[in-house]
A protein has these predicted regions:
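Hydrophobic helix-and-loop "lid/oligomerization" segment in the mid-to-C-terminal part
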Residues: 1-106, 126-127, 174-391, 405, ...
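Acidic beta-strand-to-loop metal/phosphate-binding motif
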Residues: 50-52, 105-112, 610-618
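Short alpha-helices
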Residues: 65, 141-192, 199, 627-630, ...
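Acidic, two-metal ion nucleic-acid-processing modules in DNA metabolism proteins
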Residues: 65-66, 71, 202-240, 244-288, ...
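Hydrophobic, small-residue-rich alpha-helical packing segments that form membrane-like cores
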Residues: 65-165
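A short acidic, amphipathic alpha-helical/loop segment
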Residues: 118-123, 306, 321-324, 570-574, ...
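Short loop/helix-cap segments at secondary-structure boundaries that form the rim of catalytic
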Residues: 138-145, 571-574, 591-593, 605-609
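Conserved RecA-like helicase motor core of SF1/SF2 enzymes
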Residues: 593-595, 599-645
Length: 733
């Protein structure tokens, strides 16, 4: 597997067994010798020193590393700009405010400064020296001062994060043993800043995580509150909380996470960070939903890059929102917020095939400022340049369309046989940790036939348990995996689940692809029952197979909807082009509107990003067609799509209700809907779809309720079944 990633056999041992002895020399970075000499001079003269850093996790960790090393050696203080008041990086206005209260003789920048040409000249005019330590890409001019940025000359290993550069500076000043004290802090930045986890970065992350697990700093321990810490814990639990304050206002307080030792001050700080993160999540969710509403109805065949703006967005959360949209739509994304002075300030994120920094360099005429690296960037621009930038950026990427792939594909390291010893292999995979950017947690292709997943309790998640592995499908996969299917290709990540001193292999489903469809009529009805919650009338325009095939000449924008296996077979017989389309059962893989056939779409299926929906089958009621017509940009029928209602009698409903009452008295808590059906209907012949329909009707009239814990609540009150919209939509046998 590792050889398949391009590694040589000679490098495998060092990769699998990281060693601090293999760290590169800090003096491989140009400017390091001069920086050390100037800082030693400052220490000897007891000069006042300002450390100026960025407001993200990387900047915070870089500041903390230098502060901890220097604070008992000279008079040192730090400053982090307020994202909303000061903007990104160093500015003359911000420096003037600082100098009104402080008189440093030396300014050291961390994780910023490589573009601060004018700002360094301003400091020189005040008699203040500057050392720029950064890891971002340099532009045509670099500041006229001591510069320590591995990307300037790109010698040796140059993909350090900002805190990694700060660690190299500490090592050059105090030696490797001194630098080891800060590996835990720098490992957090290395993982959070999405730099390649190879060479020095892998060593830093490996030993830093061990340090956090063995002897965590008090603030980190309070934030995570767990014994063992992984790269995923840092990326998804620790870093977002550290970043939240800087995304909303000021990150100055976050440095206290590493500098402070008082329990009560740290408890106050960690509580504040948790609140900031909750607010950040809320703002981010609103921005993503707002961006999605702007994208609904556009033709994605003409979109090479997503570029949007809004007055309502907070600039600080746009990077996360961009990443979410990249994941959903498989395209580079740039989002802008409008500032009070009318300028647009934005963030960019990219797909692996597109170096966003190089793209922005080619379009720099449109910006008042920008910076970043291959997969992420920050941008400022005047609003009157926005439309021209959108056209130019989109043209650049559409011109590269032959080299890019905006579609969703299963991309795995290798295929694993379903009968293998997954547990032993999962244990071997632990040697790959820590995983992250350019050292990804591997995913594997597993092919299986006819699996029946059970819901995990009454949650939105499902699982399939075999002797050698447990497959878990989280909420978005639940509707499609709840049905018995034909052959499915699963992309899974592999891990170990430990419970009651027993270890087992666990495969988390990342995505899936149906290679054939094997849903029987009863399962199809059960999956379509949500349609009975809809009312209204519809008037669909008829279309033809030839016209549909014309639309399919473009890769995006057309969804063909069927409601049963038979209907899918019929439409495939009518068109080889339709037969070649990917099949989605119940739920989308993402929001990217790639041409597809949707079989038994779930209630949550969002058709708003498709240009057109083709109905090629019979729904359970006309109300569902009305819902589709309301939610679709264009909707057509291919052949007869009149409703085919299902039927249920009051006698059947009475029997099911009576059995539910009897069973709930014996067993008030149910394990899952499927097991509840087996218990209730074991004494007589009732299909699972009829049972689930009965549950839906009972829930709507208030006679039977099942909470998310599986507890059954039964009411004996007299009800009118016609109060149930589902009952009104079925035939009364």
């Amino acid at each position: 597997m590792l050889l398949g990633r391009g590694m040589s056999e000679d490098s495998l041992y060092d990769y699998l067994h990281p060693s601090l002895d293999k760290l590169s020399s800090p003096y491989e970075i140009d400017g390091m010798k001069e920086a050390v000499e100037r800082i030693k001079q400052a220490i000897a003269n007891k000069e006042k020193v300002l450390i100026y850093g960025d407001y993200d996790c990387d900047g915070i960790c870089a500041i903390s590393t230098l502060m901890l090393y220097l604070r008992d050696k000279l008079d040192v203080f730090y400053f982090i700009p307020d994202r909303n008041k000061d903007g990104y990086g160093i500015s003359v206005d911000t420096l003037e405010r600082i100098l009104a209260y402080h008189s440093p003789k030396l300014v050291i920048t961390v994780d910023t400064g490589i573009t601060a040409v004018e700002e360094v000249e301003f400091l020189k005019s005040k008699g203040i020296d500057t050392i720029v330590t950064d890891h971002h890409e340099p532009q045509e001019r670099i500041p006229d001062c001591i510069v320590v940025d591995p990307k300037v000359e790109r010698k040796g290993f140059f993909d350090l994060c900002g805190a990694g550069v700060a660690l190299k500076l500490v090592e050059a000043l105090g030696g490797r043993e001194e630098a080891r004290k800060y590996l835990d802090i720098v490992s957090i930045a290395t993982i959070a800043d999405v730099v390649p986890l190879k060479n020095d970065n892998r060593i830093i992350a490996y030993y830093g995580l061990k340090q956090i697990t063995k002897s965590p700093r008090k603030g980190v321990k309070m934030l995570l509150n767990q014994e063992s810490v992984s790269a995923q814990d840092v990326m998804f639990r620790l870093a977002p909380r550290m970043n939240a304050a800087g995304r909303l206002n000021s990150a100055m307080k976050v440095v206290g996470l590493f500098l402070e030792t008082d329990y009560f001050l740290l408890r106050t700080l960690t509580d504040e960070l948790a609140r900031d993160n909750a607010q950040r999540q809320e703002l981010c969710e609103k921005a993503v939903e707002s961006a999605k509403s702007q994208l609904a109805g556009i033709n994605f065949n003409d979109v090479g890059i997503i570029v949007l703006k809004s007055n309502e967005w907070e600039a600080g959360i746009l990077g996360i929102a961009c990443a979410r949209l990249v994941e959903e739509f498989k395209r580079p994304t740039v989002l802008f917020a409008r500032t009070d002075d009318g300028e647009l300030r934005g963030s960019a994120r990219s797909i692996p095939q597109v170096n966003i920094f190089e793209l922005l360099c080619s379009l720099s005429e449109y910006f008042t400022g920008f910076g970043g690296h291959a997969q992420a960037a920050g941008i400022s621009m005047n609003e009157d340049k926005f439309d021209d930038f959108v056209k130019a950026a989109n043209k650049s990427l559409l011109d590269m369309r032959d080299k890019l792939d905006f579609t969703h594909e299963i991309s795995c390291e290798m295929e694993l046989p379903f009968d293998m010893d997954f547990l032993s292999f999962a244990k071997e995979l632990e040697l790959l940790e820590p995983t992250g950017y350019q050292n990804p947690r591997p995913t594997f292709l597993v092919k299986a036939q006819g699996l029946r997943f059970d819901r995990i309790g009454f949650s939105q998640h499902v699982k399939y348990v075999a002797k050698n592995i447990e497959l878990i499908g989280f909420s978005k996969f639940a509707p499609c995996l709840a049905a018995k299917t034909g052959r499915v290709d699963f992309e899974i990540s592999l891990g170990i689940n430990a419970f009651q001193n027993r270890e087992s292999a666990q495969g988390i489903i990342q995505t899936l692809q149906f290679e054939d469809v094997d849903i029987d009529d009863d399962e199809a009805i059960r999956m379509n029952l949500h349609q009975l919650d809809c009312e209204g009338s519809a008037n669909l325009t008829q279309t033809t197979v030839n016209r549909v095939e014309g639309w399919l000449k473009e890769p995006f924008g057309t969804a063909i909807v069927c409601f049963s296996h038979e209907e899918y077979d019929n439409v495939c017989k009518a068109s080889e082009k339709i037969k070649s389309l990917p099949v989605l059962i119940a739920t989308p893989r993402c929001l990217n509107p790639e041409n597809c056939v949707v079989l038994c779409p779930a209630d949550c299926f969002d058709f708003s990003f498709f240009n057109r929906v083709i109905v090629a089958g019979h729904p359970l009621c006309e109300g569902y067609l009305a819902k589709l017509q309301k939610e679709s940009n264009e909707i057509y029928s291919l052949g007869d799509c009149s409703p085919k209602p299902i039927s249920v009698s009051k006698d059947v409903l009475r029997k099911v209700y009576k059995e539910i009452v009897n069973v709930s008295r014996r067993t008030p808590k149910m394990a899952s809907p499927h097991k509840m059906y087996a218990m209730v209907c074991s004494g007589y012949k009732t299909s699972e779809s009829t049972f689930m329909l009965a549950l839906k009707i009972f829930d709507q009239v208030g006679t039977v309720r099942i909470n998310d814990k599986g507890f059954v609540e039964v009411s004996a009150k007299s009800v009118n079944l016609d109060d149930s919209i589902a009952y009104r939509n079925v035939s009364k046998a």
